[in-house]
């Protein structure tokens, strides 16, 4: 009985450690904890109405297919870097230091220069800090489910 209790405790402890890792990506040697937006409602809401985001956090938008993308900052209160990646998770376009916008539907679009399937939003200045160049690889952690 004591051995079974000990085994159950260890299993629970290990399960807690695995989930504590969270959902992460790596870019430019830096790990970021990310929220995933992989359906229309989540992609539409994005980072709206947030007053701040920890420096090591971001949001990863996953689209069903690679195609030209365009994002805007409607109701977004924090400046962001918007980074576009193709299906191979290579950086194909960057919109750096995009300012917040409170103009509602009057906010300008920020398009990708090439077809993209993944879009990563980080705090403004991160792309410059990492010295990102097109072709940089986005690595995804095991918690990121990528549909085929």
Description of each model-found segment:
Residues 18-148:
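Compact, glycine-rich, soluble single-domain proteins
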Residues 9-10, 39:
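Exposed boundary/loop context
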């Amino acid at each position: 009985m004591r051995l079974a209790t000990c085994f159950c405790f260890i299993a629970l402890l290990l399960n807690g450690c695995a989930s504590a890792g969270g959902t992460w990506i790596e870019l430019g040697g830096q790990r970021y904890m990310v929220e995933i937006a992989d359906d229309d409602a989540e992609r539409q809401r994005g980072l709206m109405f947030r007053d701040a985001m920890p420096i090591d956090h971001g949001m990863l938008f996953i689209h069903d297919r690679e195609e030209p993308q365009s994002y805007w900052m409607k109701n977004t209160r924090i400046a962001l870097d918007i980074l576009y990646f193709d299906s191979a998770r290579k950086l194909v376009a960057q919109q750096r230091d995009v300012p917040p916008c409170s103009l509602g539907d009057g906010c300008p679009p920020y398009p990708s220069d090439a077809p993209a399937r993944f879009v990563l939003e980080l705090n403004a200045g991160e792309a410059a800090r990492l010295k990102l160049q097109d072709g940089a690889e986005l690595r995804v952690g095991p918690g990121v489910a990528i549909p085929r």
